[in-house]
Amino acid sequence: MKIRVRDHVKVAADRMARIGLSGTARTQLDLYCVAPGQSQSPHRHEGEDKIYYVIEGSGRFTVGDSGERLEAGDALVAPAGVGHGLVNDGSALLLVLVLVAPPPAHVKRGPAS
């Protein structure tokens, strides 16, 4: 099933927007829309791996004790049990595709489920 990612871009004034694009019993695909100055607070998933793939913009991503600047075309893996987060410290919108496997039990499946 084709997903036109650009059709799902939404920007919230007060916090990062997480849009569920698709999901199965084994994966969840989200789009994070992060305006300048917005962030995802550091957190961890004990049973799920997360892969970030930047499609537009740039930002500072942390996994464990290390931080990396990611730009469009870069990816980063946050293994299960390791703290991770991000901040858009730039001046443009940051768009990130996020794959979580398996999806956390509390996550609502996206529209393509």
Question: What residue ranges belong to the model's regions?
Answer:
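Short acidic-glycine-tyrosine-enriched beta hairpin
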Residues: 66-80
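Conserved short histidine dyad/triad with adjacent acidic residue
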Residues: 30-45
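Ligand-binding loop in jelly-roll beta-barrel domains
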Residues: 80-105
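Glycine- and acidic-residue-biased ligand/ion/polar-headgroup-sensing regions
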Residues: 47-49, 53-59
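Short beta-strand segments in beta-sandwich/barrel cores
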Residues: 39-41, 57-63
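A short, N-terminal "cap"/entry segment at the start of jelly-roll beta-barrel domains
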Residues: 1-30, 77, 108-113
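Conserved hydrophobic/aromatic beta-strand scaffold that supports enzyme active sites
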Residues: 29-33, 51, 75-77, 98
